[in-house]
Structures are given as structure tokens and as C-alpha cells.
Amino acid sequence: MRHYELMVLLDPDVEERSVEPSLDQFLNVVRQDGGTVQKIDVWGRRRLAYEIRKKSEGIYAVIDLIANPQTVKELDRQLNLNENVLRTKLVRPDAR
């Protein structure tokens, strides 16, 4: 199992109070495979440097998790299929 940091940029039309529960549905993939979600940090609505899908704002969320590489790949695939997710960025902070 490896430590990952996932940043998710969500559509600004989504209500901010429903962000964490909706992300929790996707994170069940990690939990079912034996991984753990350490922290979900919702940064809230912020202005984008450039428009994405004609949106000038987005809701940022950062998630720290421990999971297998295959599980994280499936999580990223599911997030990219969701139309409320504008962008995702997955990094391993301890990989240097």
C-alpha cells in the first residue's frame, strides 16, 4: 500500500455542503479494497487561472489516502467519468 494525495476540482454548480458526501461515495472503492482515507480537506470555491468547460470557478478538495496502485487507478477512472468533476490530479508525496 502506498500513500497518495488526490486533488479534485469540482463543478462550481455543486453545493459545497454536498461535496464531501459525494466524494465519500467514490472513496468507498478505496475502503472496499482494504485502503484507508486519512483526510478529506474541502478548500471551497476558488477562481481558476483559466476556464475549464466554460467555468471560471471550481470547488477544490484534497484527499490523503493509502491504497494499492490498482485501486487508485480505478478511483481516478471513476472520478473522470463523473460530469461534476472538472479535473483530478493524483500524486505520491513520498515518491522522490
Curated annotation (Swiss-Prot):
Superkingdom, natural source: Bacteria
Q: Which GO terms describe its biological process?
A: translation
The record's listing under Pfam families reads: Ribosomal_S6
**Alphabetically ordered keywords of this record:** Ribonucleoprotein, Ribosomal protein, RNA-binding, rRNA-binding
Keyword NADP present in the record's keywords: the answer is no
| GO molecular function annotation | small ribosomal subunit rRNA binding; structural constituent of ribosome
Q: Entry's CDD domains?
A: bS6
Give an example GO cellular component term for this record. Answer: cytoplasm
Q: Which Gene3D superfamilies match?
A: 3.30.70.60
- InterPro entries from the UniProt entry: Ribosomal_bS6 (IPR000529), Ribosomal_bS6_CS (IPR020815), Ribosomal_bS6_sf (IPR035980), Ribosomal_S6_plastid/chlpt (IPR020814), Transl_elong_EF1B/ribsomal_bS6 (IPR014717)
Query: Does the record carry Ribosomal protein as a key word?
Result: yes
In UniProt terms, what function does this protein have?
Binds together with bS18 to 16S ribosomal RNA.
UniProt family annotation: Belongs to the bacterial ribosomal protein bS6 family.
Record-linked PANTHER family: MITOCHONDRIAL 28S RIBOSOMAL PROTEIN S6 (PTHR21011), SMALL RIBOSOMAL SUBUNIT PROTEIN BS6M (PTHR21011:SF1)
Protein name per Swiss-Prot or TrEMBL:
Small ribosomal subunit protein bS6
